Curated annotation (Swiss-Prot):
Disulfide bonds: none annotated. It comes from Oleidesulfovibrio alaskensis (strain ATCC BAA-1058 / DSM 17464 / G20) (Desulfovibrio alaskensis). Monomer. SUPFAM superfamilies: EF-Tu/eEF-1alpha/eIF2-gamma C-terminal domain (SSF50465), P-loop containing nucleoside triphosphate hydrolases (SSF52540), Translation proteins (SSF50447). The gene is tuf. This is Elongation factor Tu. It comes from the Bacteria. Residues 81-84 are annotated as: G3.
Amino acid sequence: MGKEKFERTKPHVNIGTIGHIDHGKTTLTAAITKIASLKMGSKAVAYDEIDKAPEEKERGITIATAHVEYETTLRHYAHVDCPGHADYIKNMITGAAQMDGAIIVVAATDGPMPQTREHILLARQVGVPSIVVFLNKCDMVDDEELLELVELEVRELLSSYDFPGDDTPVIRGSALKALECDSADDDAAKPILELLDACDSYIPEPERDTDKPFLMPIEDVFSISGRGTVVTGRVERGIIKVGEQIEIVGIKDTMTTTCTGVEMFRKLLDQGQAGDNVGVLLRGVKRDDVERGQVLAAPKSITPHKKFKAEVYVLSKEEGGRHTPFFSGYRPQFYFRTTDITGIIGLEEGVEMVMPGDNATFIVELIHPVAMEQGLRFAIREGGRTVGAGVVSEILE
C-alpha cells in the first residue's frame, strides 16, 4: 500500500519522551514509529536517525531535538526526543517543543534515577499536563516482584510531584524487542500498542488556541486622527470581536476599554483570532495611555504581577552567554513577550551562585508588573544579549 496522506481530520497532540540517560527513550521513540507504521502505514524512523538529532536555535540557545510523527486510529502525534540531558532541560524551559503530555521511560533494571526525578519535577514546573509511564527492559528482569516494586516506586515519585501516581498508566515492555518486530501482531509489539492506547485515552486533547481567552501582546501604538488609538500585535490566543470589552494589562494600572475596530492588511474585519497580525482600535484611550509590553486581554483572564518563582536555564559561554557566575541580587532585564523589564534575582536557600550552563530556580522581583500566569516563558538579557531563558513556575505576588 502507498503512503497515506497526512490527514488533518484527526486531533493533533504534541508529546515527548523524557527520563534518565540510557533508559531507552530513543529506542522507544524508534519502536513507536515502527509499530505505528506497521499498523497505520505511517513512516518508521530508525534509531540512528533520531539519535543524530539536528541542533536548533531557540532564543539563541542551541538544542538538539529529534521530531518524529505518527498516527493512531484516533490521533496524529508530533513527538520530540532529545539526545542529551541538557537538551531536555533547555527544551522544557524554553518551550521550544511544546508538550501536551510526556512518556517517561524508566528502565526496570534500574528503577527511577536522578534524571527521572529531575524531568518529572521540570514537567510539573513548566506545566506538562499529564505523564504516561513506559517501564522498559522488562525482558531483562525475571522477578515479577521486582517489577511490581519498580512500578510502585515510579508511582510514588509521580505522586510526590503532584501527578496522580495511582491513576497513571504504567505499561511494561521492551522497546528493543518491539523494534525487532515484523508485525504489529507480534507479542513484543503489544506493549507499544498499549502505550499508544494509553496516550490516546489518558493525555487530554489540548484546548485549541482559538478557544482560550483572548490575549494579544502590544507591539506598537498609533493614533489615527478622528478615529482614536490603534494598537498592533499578533493575537496569541482567543478571538477578539468588534464591540467586545477588553482590558489593557501590565506596567500601569489595568484599564478597561472597548474594541471598536479590527483591521488586518488595511482591511476592516469583524474579528481577529489566534495567529493573526492585527490592529485593534480602542475606544476612549489616549496614545500615551498604552505602551509596548502591555497586553490586550479578555476581562479578568490575566492579572499583572511583579514577584514570581521561575525555572531558568543560564546560557553557557559557548552559547554566547556570560563567562562568569552571578549571585543573589543580580539585576538583568527580563524580556516578556515584547519588552524588557528590569528585575532583581534571588537564589534559593543554600545556593551560593549560578554558573553559565546551569539550570536553577530563581525568585524574581520586577520593577513594573507584567501580565503573567504559570507557564509564561521569558528571556533574561544583559544589554540586549540573551544570557538565560526561563519559565514562570509560580506567581508569588
